């Protein structure tokens, strides 16, 4: 018996009146994961397309894989470098024995020595990322299924993307209970309360991270959370620039200066999925080509960022080093690239009119630079900039639609 035949034979048990009716949401999610549903619209207009919401979400999920794999490799590499910088000999062995991430890596064939290869770095990074992702997926999935069962509709595939995006924008050292709490806030408060997928006006992943930032700032920001090494403290490159300009960009674990190419490739501490602009560009090119992400929004974000950062460069400052950060550094530091490619382009919380997308993107770019440069307490600004722009997205669309209506009335109203 083939899989499709098996799913068809048991379908009636999950339909209204069947003995497993309450589990229809789970059955539908599993069935449509493997096969495109044969549903058609009952009224005109009819559009036939095998790419449904689930396929779109899977494409976005696959698009973040380059950043995810590089992030695991980089997280492991940064941790190993920091450990060997702080400890050696018996002291290093004792540290490894006391941390399950370290000894599990060695048990699986890796090494924590300074000559560790890419496999060891990937293994160590995976021991940090995969538990976070699994926690986020299970806890968030529980809330998603619960709301679907209460509302008696199919599981919304939007969480498939929300879960991995959230896991990629947090530090590798985030406690698992906080990861569960953050995704709970994002799914329940920022999405399901407003009706679920397609009705939320805030990006759920960013809303969850913002909740953690304000509720538990010690585990989501500062100098202790970005490198997964016991006893190690090291600021992100963005924080270092804020403190002393380009000359302050030093990788404390290796003692080497951080170049622009290091930041572009992703050889710097940071959130798991945000460090490599190159990997993010690869994924972004795919979803833009597939028509999932709007190039207008991405272009607007770049325009807003370049214009305001250049203006600050011209103004200059002797007391605030962030005034002197060029636009190409803004692009590769912090969460700018990840936010621009995968958060700002969220089709639900972003503007949907073409002109609105430009305004929405420009606002994000401007607000990100403004927060980074002017706010001395918070060097990163992309998260707050996108959430702020989410609030204005409906206004942009309303203005565009009203202007189009007035223009057409003026053109054809008297005929």
Curated annotation (Swiss-Prot):
The keyword Transcription does not apply. Its cofactor is riboflavin; FMN. It catalyses: a ubiquinone + n Na(+)(in) + NADH + H(+) = a ubiquinol + n Na(+)(out) + NAD(+). GO terms for biological process: respiratory electron transport chain; sodium ion transport; transmembrane transport. It is found in: Cell inner membrane. It holds the Pfam family NQR2_RnfD_RnfE. InterPro entries: NqrB, NqrB/RnfD. GO terms for cellular component: plasma membrane. One of its GO terms (molecular function) is riboflavin binding. Disulfide bonds: none annotated. Its EC number is 7.2.1.1. The chain crosses the membrane at residues 23-40, 56-76, 129-149, 164-184, 275-295, 297-317, 325-345, 358-378, 381-401. Belongs to the NqrB/RnfD family. PANTHER family: ELECTRON TRANSPORT COMPLEX PROTEIN RNFD, NA(+)-TRANSLOCATING NADH-QUINONE REDUCTASE SUBUNIT B. This is Na(+)-translocating NADH-quinone reductase subunit B.
